[in-house]
Amino acid sequence: MQEQYRPEDIETQVQLHWQEKQTFKVTEDASKEKYYCLSMLPYPSGRLHMGHVRNYTIGDVISRYQRMLGKNVLQPIGWDAFGLPAEGAAVKNNTAPAPWTYDNIEYMKNQLKLLGFGYDWDREIATCKPDYYRWEQWFFTKLYEKGMVYKKTSAVNWCPHDLTVLANEQVIDGCCWRCDTKVERKEIPQWFIKITDYAEQLLNDLDTLESWPEQVKTMQRNWIGRSEGVDIVFDVVDSEEKLSVYTTRPDTFMGVTYVAVAAGHPLSLQAAATNPALADFVAECRNTKVAEAEMATMEKKGMATGLYAIHPLTGEKLPIWAANFVLMDYGTGAVMAVPGHDARDWEFATKYNLPIKPVILAADGSEPDLSQEAMTEKGTLFNSGEFDGLNHEDGFNAIADKLVALGVGQRKVNYRLRDWGVSRQRYWGAPIPMVTLEDGTVVPTPEDQLPVILPEDVVMDGISSPIKADPEWAKTTVNGIPGLRETDTFDTFMESSWYYARYTCPQYDDGMLDPAAANYWLPVDQYVGGIEHAIMHLMYFRFFHKLLRDAGLVDSDEPAKRLLCQGMVLADAFYYTGNNGERIWVSPVDAIVERDDKGRIVKAVDAEGHELVYAGMSKMSKSKNNGIDPQVMVEKYGADTVRLFMMFASPAEMTLEWQESGVEGANRFLKRVWRLAFDHTAKGAVKPLDIASLTEEQKSLRRDLHKTIAKVTDDVGRRQTFNTAIAAVMELMNKLGRAPQETEQDRALMQEALLAVVRMLYPFTPHVCFSLWQALGGEGDIDTAPWPIADEQAMVEDSKLVVVQVNGKVRGRITVPADATEQQVRERAGQEHLVAKYLDGVTVRKVIYVPGKLLNLVVG
């Protein structure tokens, strides 16, 4: 082997070897235990960022480790290739989304290969290819035939900049998640999939996901939002109309003082027809923010409709108000207001001088003070007629039962989860396979006309979708009847909801999935991706799997057994203030910094001499210009160093702070491993280790080696604490570096240790380990080598170090045989002269012995 560690030579050669040998290509093999490891597929934005590198390194480490355990490991990769950014980039670069996307895929594919990820490239998919989305279109038509798909006009979150609909989850603080433009409300026809039909399953099956992070499961539970309550019907004075509301607090029903309805509710619209001021208010509400966080904090506004509802139990007339905080899409578009016991109702009632009636006693049994705020805690009913004195549960049931008995109430389980709106008014997406015939009938595209192909050779004007702008594209016939194709495209979450299943049979042409392959590989054993996908992608991913199961395409209930959510990658962020007061962000690569003796940044300037403000560590992003290009780091240090730093610098699920000094440290460590192996191999051939004749020092070193193997095995396999696994190997390397190399036995032990170290590091740093394995004379390629197994016998301690205390104070430490009795330990302690002087002339009154650890002699 060469004397110097040169990653640029090693990595190119090893990657070429993997490519030629197709090392990571797999097929179904019933004789082997399978393991499917999957990282969330990337959007081909043009360049990999450090977040990608972290995600894919974690997946690759797990995959390589599982291969070494002898499993048949599938690790595929592909491209989530549709989506809005491609349209913007195409306009900006005067091209079309397709060529821009395919160029990016090619570039990023090469970047992934440079990092040495062990993917089965034969299974690569791009979701924008017709051979992928044809099956998505086919499945949608099947869901339509099953009654799982419908179209309705609904108020949507509309981004006026991107000219598209946003899901509620994509509205952040009232603005578009992508471009930060203020979101508006708009009524348009949309296609929906009935995810609400699966709400109960999606909720209950979270309990089966024992190896998913608790945080993700909690977020999904809250998003599904199961509640038990009562649907209540109110009559409306002088009207045939009925008003229906849902409440989870029927115990407060005697405290209702008004009813609030959405601006778009039929009663609001009826009243607005003769009330111009109300009509203006209804129009204003059309642009109300709809993200829940916004709803909670925005100013509550309303207007009396002049209509009244009748309380079903008391007969009281309750004013009906149109309010901006009630949404037509949620529940019935009407809520009963109990201002005494609901914060939002109290705020509204206080603003508009509506009555506030307390009906629940305070915890101390007194009437609550409602002058400053509502009392929202549960308690004993009062002011509630026949229900006075009942506790919360009894009050809930008694009032619910009475409403049911009177025929004006019905117990109901409700969910916060809404049906999934999958229509997008964009071009670069899979066309929705539906046709409107000339008589107005809507039918699915026949199977023999699938896929409905998206034309790729288009001109982007940045305003309208090319397929909407071209009247010819939509024209088609179904069974000889002319019709128009749907020009909306699918939400891109559709593609990423089933890609994991298509990886099991990407070339299969006879259907969406090959049942044999899908059921061999599925469910995914390990899924890796960011926590930011907890409620969108990961919910749709689980939902789609259940749809596939119910269509007979897979036979498992959940798509992934184990989920690891990696933390974000942070980097230093610097800026200076421009002439117009704006912040101009400067890359940390271009910042010249001064640090204090604790390493803290005290001063920074850029090359032009601007004094920089240090904004701390923040997520690597384009907006703060603090991304570090992985390719630059790979060229400077090698892929193995970058991978090692990524896995060592922080626990996988925590944020990782990018520090180039840490990268240099990882590089120095690999050079040390290389140097130790070089020095060892330079001494020539090694004889076999004779375990029976090891010296005490050699036994101790071998014990450390096998304890390290046991720890690293547990850390990588069960605990997934990869940083502590690497730390354990580093600690062992320090001991190996100090170990004598005089005798044949010394060298034989070093050979055993280095072969184990190289295998333990292989999942993290595969290129250098491939070379070292060859240099050390390992059998075959390391790619097929088994994971090292800890020798239980080697780990048995021959002796123990026992701390000796006299009256609770440490007076000495003694080495005793591992199987020494308490009496033998006491005798040995008495011979230790540091201990003996404290026992001279005193009586031992009590002995406390913790076997193999501590001896405390109480004397007097």
UniProtKB/Swiss-Prot annotation:
Any one Gene Ontology BP term: leucyl-tRNA aminoacylation
Main EC class the enzyme belongs to: ligase
An example Gene Ontology molecular-function term: leucine-tRNA ligase activity
A single GO cellular-component term on record: cytosol
Binding site for ATP: 622
Gene3D superfamilies registered for this protein in UniProt: 2.20.28.290, 3.10.20.590, HUPs (3.40.50.620), Isoleucyl-tRNA Synthetase, Domain 1 (1.10.730.10), Valyl/Leucyl/Isoleucyl-tRNA synthetase, editing domain (3.90.740.10)
Motif window: 'KMSKS' region: 619-623
Record's subcellular location: Cytoplasm
Keyword Methyltransferase attached: no
Catalytic activity: tRNA(Leu) + L-leucine + ATP = L-leucyl-tRNA(Leu) + AMP + diphosphate
Record key words, sorted: Aminoacyl-tRNA synthetase, ATP-binding, Cytoplasm, Ligase, Nucleotide-binding, Protein biosynthesis
Main location: cytoplasm
Protein family per UniProt: Belongs to the class-I aminoacyl-tRNA synthetase family.
NCBIfam families per record: leuS_bact
Protein name (database record): Leucine--tRNA ligase
Species of provenance: Yersinia pestis
